[in-house]
From Swiss-Prot:
EC number of this enzyme: 2.1.1.77
Keyword terms of this UniProt record: Cytoplasm, Methyltransferase, S-adenosyl-L-methionine, Transferase
Top enzyme class: transferase
GO biological process, one term: methylation
Subcellular location: Cytoplasm
Gene3D superfamilies linked: Vaccinia Virus protein VP39
UniProt-listed InterPro entries: PCMT (IPR000682), SAM-dependent_MTases_sf (IPR029063)
UniProt source species: Alkalilimnicola ehrlichii (strain ATCC BAA-1101 / DSM 17681 / MLHE-1)
Name assigned to this protein: Protein-L-isoaspartate O-methyltransferase
Pfam families registered for this protein in UniProt: PCMT (PF01135)
NCBIfam families: pimt (TIGR00080), PRK00312.1 (NF001453)
Record's GO cellular component terms: cytoplasm
Entry-linked PANTHER family: PROTEIN-L-ISOASPARTATE O-METHYLTRANSFERASE (PTHR11579), PROTEIN-L-ISOASPARTATE(D-ASPARTATE) O-METHYLTRANSFERASE (PTHR11579:SF0)
Length: 221
């Protein structure tokens, strides 16, 4: 992806993006690699054109089908947690949505395998990756709760919708030393963003923040 091709003007300009990055830094995002990715990946291309002027607000936005693109702080913090120790070679993402989170990871050099259960969103995300020449992102239409065993093990797993608990198949696909970042709690319950690490065969869990995500649902549509 050539960031210079997608600078935008007005409310999508580089100056607007820089203001967002400054705000994220003020709110605790420290990793300069993550801040650079947020600066360079054109979030306005991952939302409806009518919402482009709000793309660099630190807020979630609707993307249709009852789904949202996460607020930039959440994307930045989840990314920061995944790459804290090293850039993972392969990451599995459950819940492609618009594709923005996957694009941020790909900008950082990660090979991303992402699954979306809503066909229209999967098709749109796949086309965006082609348009942006993000060849490291592989989009699959399907039920993410089963993971994507074909490309396992993953050094990172990121869940962008909230399950009650982490789906069991994902544990078999997380590499030793790998990290899983997910919002847990499901619909109608308080949710917490957690980091789970596999260390010497054991799973170590850490609470990161209180969050609000759409629920992780099974099946496809």
């Amino acid at each position: 992806m050539d960031p210079n091709r997608y600078q935008g003007i007005g409310m999508t300009s580089r100056r607007t993006r820089e203001r967002l990055v400054s705000r994220l830094a003020e709110e605790g995002i420290r990793d300069p690699r993550v801040l650079q990715a947020i600066l360079e990946v054109p979030r306005h291309l991952f939302v409806d054109e009518a919402l482009a002027s709000r793309a660099y607000d630190n807020t979630p936005l609707p993307i249709g089908h009852g789904q949202t693109i996460s607020q930039p702080w959440v994307v930045a913090r989840m990314t920061e947690l995944l790459i804290e120790q090293s850039i993972p070679e392969r990451v599995l993402e459950l819940g492609t949505g618009s594709g923005y989170q996957a694009a941020v990871l790909a900008y950082l050099g990660v090979e991303v395998y992402t699954i979306e259960r809503i066909k229209a969103l999967a098709d749109q995300a796949r086309q965006r990756m082609r348009d942006l020449r993000l060849h490291r992102v592989h989009v699959r239409y399907g039920d993410g709760s089963e993971g994507w065993a074909q490309h396992a093990p993953y050094q990172g797993i990121i869940v962008t919708a909230a399950p009650e608990e982490v789906p069991d198949p994902l544990w078999d696909q997380l590499d030793e030393g790998g990290r899983l970042v997910a919002p847990l709690g499901g619909a109608g319950r308080p949710q917490e963003l957690v980091l789970i690490e596999r260390v010497d065969g054991e799973l170590r869990r850490r609470h990161v923040a209180s969050v609000s995500f759409v629920p992780l649902l099974g099946g496809c549509r």
